[in-house]
Curated annotation (Swiss-Prot):
One of its GO terms (cellular component) is PAM complex, Tim23 associated import motor. Pfam families: Pam17. Belongs to the PAM17 family. It comes from Debaryomyces hansenii (strain ATCC 36239 / CBS 767 / BCRC 21394 / JCM 1990 / NBRC 0083 / IGC 2968) (Yeast). The lineage of its organism: Eukaryota, Fungi, Dikarya, Ascomycota, Saccharomycotina. The chain crosses the membrane at residues 44-64, 82-102. It is found in: Mitochondrion inner membrane. This is Presequence translocated-associated motor subunit PAM17, mitochondrial.
């Protein structure tokens, strides 16, 4: 009976197959690919921030253009045109703050296959940054802290330069104290 509906052959075929638990079907993300994805994420966030800033200002301007305001009466003691201009700038600022949320969502959708590995690599990268960064208590105008959070590291050369800058900061802090 099992042979008639095809279950018998399927169950025998799955038993005979060897299963490898220690390897995954995907290759691991290397540091160059991770840093390229990090750069792409940052650029997408900046572009979406610019777009949402303009959209927020436009939406605020559209709303203010449709309401009736008496131009001869001050609003909170200020000229109504100044208040409206400030509201448009405030709307653009709020839109700018929403940009990274949209940019990160777009980045996640675009790189859905590599997101799990990207997050793992990001945690490892942040642990490396935390381990190698300098103590900012000895900074001065002549000896500034080199990129405390590692936000501008987008290539291996940037990372190596950041490590050299951290070592130079430590050396200068030790010599001048």
């Amino acid at each position: 009976m099992l042979k008639n509906i095809g279950i018998y052959n399927r169950s025998i075929n799955t038993i005979g197959r060897s299963v490898r638990f220690n390897s995954s079907g995907k290759s691991s993300l290397n540091w160059v690919e991770y840093l390229n994805l990090k750069k792409q994420n940052n650029r997408l966030n900046v572009a979406s921030s610019a777009f949402t800033s303009l959209a927020g200002a436009f939406i605020t301007l559209t709303y203010l253009g449709n309401i009736e305001i008496q131009v001869d009466k001050p609003i909170m003691g200020l000229d109504p045109f100044m208040v409206m201009g400030g509201a448009v700038i405030l709307g653009g600022g709020v839109g700018y703050l929403f940009g990274p949320f949209i940019g990160t969502a777009l980045f996640s959708l675009k790189n859905k296959a590599a997101m799990h590995q990207f997050k793992i690599k990001d945690q490892i990268f942040l642990q490396k940054i935390k381990h190698h960064r300098v103590d900012p208590s000895s900074q001065s105008f002549s000896n500034p802290v080199p990129d405390y959070y590692g936000e501008r590291i987008y290539s291996l050369n940037n990372y190596k330069q950041w490590l050299r800058d951290c070592n130079a900061f430590r050396r200068k802090a030790k010599e001048f104290l």
